[in-house]
Every structure is written in C-alpha cells, then in structure tokens.
A protein has these predicted regions:
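ABC ATP-binding cassette signature C-motif
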Residues: 1-171
C-alpha cells in the first residue's frame, strides 16, 4: 500500500515587501517521509514550514492538505505563557493517570529531561533555560499524535545529549 499523501504545495510564492522569499515552490509530503530543508540564512526555510503548517498563507499558489492530517510545528521561538507549567504546556488537559503510565510519554520525558519526576511538570515556563524551553516544545510535539512534525532548528539550545537523543528518537 502506498504511503498516504499528507500535503501538497503547487507553485507557492510569497513575498515580504519587494523581496520574494518563495518563488513557485512545489512539493508533496507523504506519510513516513523524512526530509530536510537546507539553505542559507533568510532563504525562506522557516517561511516554507509555516506555509506547510498552515500558520501562514502564500501570496500565490495552492496548498492542499489531507483532511485528516494532524500537523505540528516547532518554530525557532519557544513560546508559552510564562506562568504555564511544563505539565500544562506538554500534557494539556490529559489526566495524570492517563499519561503517567504511558511508556511512550515516559520515554520521551526521560530522553529529553533525564527523568520522569513530578518536579519537572511543576516548573513554570518562565523559570526554564533556553535548552529546557526547547525540550518542552519538542516533548509536546512528540507526545501529541501528529501525522507531520515540522522542526525548525530543533537542536538550537540543546546540549550534546539532547541532540543525540533526538536524532535516535526520530529515526
């Protein structure tokens, strides 16, 4: 059985002011695909991901998404309400008995934070370092049941152990 097509971009263009950031970009993303977008700073990689995620609309062209495709994006800016706890950001309204016994969630937290202790879930977003904020964003995406995960500079602020864990987890 062929992989399910998740999203298509056809002749997508976007400009900011007088400068074209994307010019007639066409691509398709299928379930199970792993791709990298490379280019120099300011070349439009982040903008392309925002269009794929539906966060930004192109000036021209068409974006077609599978109706059931669940898409998440980790942008370059790690943001959450400063008073939100790690548990609020990552787990949302899930009941503790639902997530605490889930081996996948335990593995993600242990891999990204080194443990699965309650104190991690109680820390506020404002109290976290840059690397910890990045780990929170990654944990949220990896725990959510998504079909497509877009990672924009995912290793920014991560230490060597975090980069190694993420690389092995995404295989």
């Amino acid at each position: 059985m062929a992989p399910r097509n998740l999203i298509n971009l056809e002749n997508v263009s976007l400009s900011y002011g007088k400068g074209a950031v994307l010019d007639q970009v066409s691509l398709g993303l299928a379930e199970g695909a792993r791709i990298g977008i490379v280019g120099r700073n300011g070349a439009g990689k982040s903008t392309l991901m925002k269009i794929i995620a539906g966060v930004e609309d192109p000036d021209e062209g068409r974006v077609t998404k599978s109706n059931s495709a669940r898409i998440g994006i980790l942008s370059q800016i790690d943001s959450a309400a400063p008073q939100s706890t790690v548990g609020d950001v990552v787990l949302g309204n899930r009941e503790k008995h639902d997530w605490a016994s889930d081996p996948r969630i335990r593995e993600i937290f242990t891999g990204l934070f080194g443990s699965f202790d309650d104190h991690i879930f109680e820390r506020t977003f404002a109290s976290l370092s840059g690397g910890e904020k990045r780990r929170v964003g990654l944990a949220k995406l990896l725990i959510d049941d998504l079909d497509l995960i877009l990672l924009d500079e995912p290793t920014n602020h991560l230490d060597v152990e975090g980069v190694a864990w993420l690389a092995s987890h995404l295989k």
